[in-house]
Amino acid sequence: MGNFQLEDFVAGWIGGAASVIVGHPLDTVKARLQAGSGYGSTLSCIRTVYRRESVFGFFKGMSFPLASIAVYNSVVFGVFSNTQRFLSHHRCQEPEAGPPHVLSDLLLASMVAGVVSVGLGAPVDLIEIRLQMQTQPFQEANLGLKPRVAALGEQPAYQGPVHCFATIVRTEGLAGLYRGASAMLLRDVPGYCLYFIPYVFLSDWITPEACAGPSPCAVWLAGGMAGAISWGTATPMDVVKSRLQADGVYVNKYRGVLDCMSQSYQKEGLKVFFRGITVNAVRGFPMSAAMFLGYELSLQAIRGDHVVTSP
């Protein structure tokens, strides 16, 4: 355990808080586009949310992820960095031997981080989605609701994150907190591979050989590009995850991942799995740029380094 470093978790917590503040407005738009109805496009969704709920509608449900996703990112970055460091040292047998970044080490560390992220993050993601979706416009024809049930969609189902948590546990049991977790696993394991690996190699590529480590500008650019790549490619399974997690606010439509994919394809065609891809990619850049920059600068401050150190 000599390679274990607690500061990776602390820096991940700081970076996670920064990413939530930067990315939550677009995250709300993404959730409405993917799991809601009545929005023709990204701009239409933004206008509708602003007109009906003002600017505060874009920050609906942010208090819970701000408190929890910071911890979530702390664990993800801490697990990734320590796993990658352990694998590298185990492979080389010498702490300072061998190249700092080997693809196989990064790949396995990313997969471990992805699995851990689902166990910790699925309930957080579920509550965030439910809070974001509870005031979205439901269309009676699309959902097949009776008029009385459809009318309930105009009133918020949850009074806040604590009430949302308690309601889900009471009505769906503890297993309800992990609704959509299988889709999240299929999204996050490859997603984190396409998150950490591009970041590491892009930051190394951008940084001149004479420099001891990447500059904050290089971290910002590499982190943003990695986020856009990861979130863009994760969109199809992100759509399925969002629909499964939003399912249950007013009505249950899906029996699982395959049923959700089948129903979505039959009703809306292949294009439905790419709904929100623009928002995902655009949102992924500033969120990930803030995440990696907050992480690296915090790590630099904690360790007293003069250069940024890649995970």
Swiss-Prot record:
Under Gene Ontology molecular function, one entry of this record is:
transmembrane transporter activity
Transmembrane regions listed in the UniProt entry: 9-29, 61-81, 107-127, 193-213, 217-237, 277-295
Subcellular location field: Mitochondrion inner membrane
Chief place of localization: mitochondrion
UniProt cross-references to SUPFAM superfamilies, sorted A to Z? Mitochondrial carrier
Bilayer disposition of the protein: Multi-pass membrane protein
Annotated Solcar repeats reside at 3-86, 100-205, 214-301
Q: Identify the PROSITE patterns for this entry.
A: SOLCAR
Alphabetized, the UniProt keywords read:
Membrane, Mitochondrion, Mitochondrion inner membrane, Repeat, Transmembrane, Transmembrane helix, Transport
Tell me a GO cellular component: mitochondrion
**Similarity field:** Belongs to the mitochondrial carrier (TC 2.A.29) family.
Q: PANTHER family, alphabetically? A: MITOCHONDRIAL BASIC AMINO ACIDS TRANSPORTER-RELATED (PTHR45624), SOLUTE CARRIER FAMILY 25 MEMBER 48 (PTHR45624:SF7)
Q: What is this protein called?
A: Solute carrier family 25 member 48
Per the UniProt record, the source organism is: Bos taurus (Bovine)
